[in-house]
């Protein structure tokens, strides 16, 4: 049921969004957990996950993006659409709910979405986003733990193929040194 997540969408995306929703509702545990969390948010007063608009707009300057004010995921073309990128944009929409006014802090948001997707992929035996994360705009931001290592350097030093749960927990301990308003709600729960 597309109405569970989407308010509106470009008609050419209908079949792809149907496949995406089928996967989210019936796929791996991580995908079902995201849907369950969205349902939880919508049942509580903690925040409201607004249904997304998913549009194709050839005038976009990038292949895809999440536009917060309109709660819209834009793809430049049908060829730019992928379930993986839509999944990440849904993570951004959830971050907006969890962080409220703080969600646009660039140090945190893009890297955190990659880390969440990496962790969910790891749990399900898949590959991660390490290479994608290395190329992101804010990858040069310094970790806020008194070390001079950048996010890119940390990822390279701890390449996805070498990471295990203990490595993620170690990084999480560093992540928790970031001021409280920027901490990752979902990942901090996972480490407890």
Q: Positions of the model-derived regions?
A:
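Substrate-binding clefts and substrate-entry loops adjacent to catalytic sites
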Residues: 69-76, 94-104
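Extended amphipathic alpha-helical coiled-coil/heptad-repeat regions
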Residues: 26-33, 37-46
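Catalytic zinc-binding patch centered on the HExxH motif and its immediate surroundings
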Residues: 39-80
């Amino acid at each position: 049921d597309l109405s569970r997540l989407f308010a509106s969408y470009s008609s050419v995306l209908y079949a792809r969004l149907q496949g995406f929703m089928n996967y989210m509702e019936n796929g791996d545990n991580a995908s079902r957990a995201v849907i369950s969390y969205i349902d939880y948010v919508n049942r509580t007063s903690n925040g409201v996950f607004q249904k997304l608009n998913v549009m194709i707009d050839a005038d976009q300057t990038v292949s895809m993006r999440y536009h917060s004010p309109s709660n819209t995921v834009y793809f430049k073309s049908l060829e730019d659409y992928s379930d993986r990128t839509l999944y990440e944009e849904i993570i951004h929409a959830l971050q907006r709910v969890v962080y409220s006014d703080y969600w646009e802090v660039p140090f945190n948001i893009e890297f955190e979405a990659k880390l969440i997707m990496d962790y969910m992929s790891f749990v399900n035996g898949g590959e991660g986003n390490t290479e994608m994360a290395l190329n992101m705009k804010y990858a040069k931001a310094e970790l806020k733990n008194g070390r001079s290592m950048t996010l890119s350097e940390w990822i390279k030093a701890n390449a996805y193929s070498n990471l295990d749960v203990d490595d993620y927990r170690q990084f999480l301990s560093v992540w928790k040194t970031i001021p409280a308003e920027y901490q990752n709600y979902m990942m901090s729960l996972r480490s407890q």
